[in-house]
Amino acid sequence: TSIIPDMDPTRPAKADPRKLHAAIERFGVTQLFGSPALMQVLATHGEKLATVKRVTSAGAPVPPAVVQRMLELLPPDAQLWTPYGATECLPVAVIEGRELLTLRARTETGAGTCVGRPVAGNTVRIIRISDDAIGDWDDALLVGAGQVGEITVAGPSATDSYFNRDAQTALAKIRERLADGSERIVHRMGDLGWFDGEGRLWFCGRKSQRVVVDDLTTLCTEQVEPVFNTHPLLLRSALVGVGEKGAQRPVLVYELKPGVNADVAEVSDELRHIAEGFVHTGKVKAFLHHPNPFPVDIRHNAKIGREKLAAWAAKQAIKDSE
């Protein structure tokens, strides 16, 4: 039996936690699925979820603090899963919340977000970053161990094409001939990531949202933003690039927590100090406070509209440590 709570499904971040709990208690809900934005609502509300045995959250990375708080609200034997995938291929990989929390320090120092080990049946490989179409698979596309590249997946749930969208199909699909002479389609996720030594996949952000500073420096959103999100006054942040790709200026746009009345110049200075703690974040010199809530996707309310924020940042008078 599926229970649909009293909420606007296009605005999970605005859901009333009291109504969510009312539905959970009335029907004795044991399994819960929701976007990270909905998890944030429940975590902030802070009421125990006594009947829930399994939680699944997908659509965007779940902040470590939200994972920790949700586990505190669940029964000790309950599980919290954060699967990784896309409409074109789901699921790709999965990790349980407790393992994710053991990796929190790595996420908050620039490793990216661990999305777990590939699901059985999937062949997940990392290829060199390119915005061009790739017609046929070649092992020469693969990056070295531990290097960041584009995540690709071949498996039973990967789609072969987009309906009546030949250009998009060419950019997202690679034809691979197997040793037995058969062929399969490899899907390019459009995400950047890498594998650690234990076979776990790490998500580093969308390929289209990477910031290319120069030929030697590319910054990935999920390797930069979690470092700054450790600031106690920040609700979230977004790395954006201003200027042409290949010569972009990295800018960190940030949103303060609701109700916080802070000197944004001081906050920006504190963020600059955080940036200086790591080589990759040291490239970020400009910080902009966004006075309104970030633009987000209508479905999950968790995917940040970085393209819109980049356009907004480009219109601001940017200076170092603004």
Model region roles, listed by residue range:
Residues 1, 30, 53, 235, ...:
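Short acidic/polar active-site loop segments enriched in Thr and Asp
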Residues 22-25, 34, 53, 62, ...:
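Conserved AMP-binding/adenylate-forming
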Residues 3, 143, 196, 202, ...:
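Generic structural signal for well-ordered beta-strand positions
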Residues 1-31:
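Conserved AMP-binding/adenylation subdomain of ANL enzymes
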Residues 238-243, 251-252, 273-322:
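Conserved C-terminal "lid"/linker of ANL adenylate-forming enzymes
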Residues 22-25, 32-33, 155, 160-161, ...:
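AMP-binding/adenylate-forming catalytic core of the ANL superfamily
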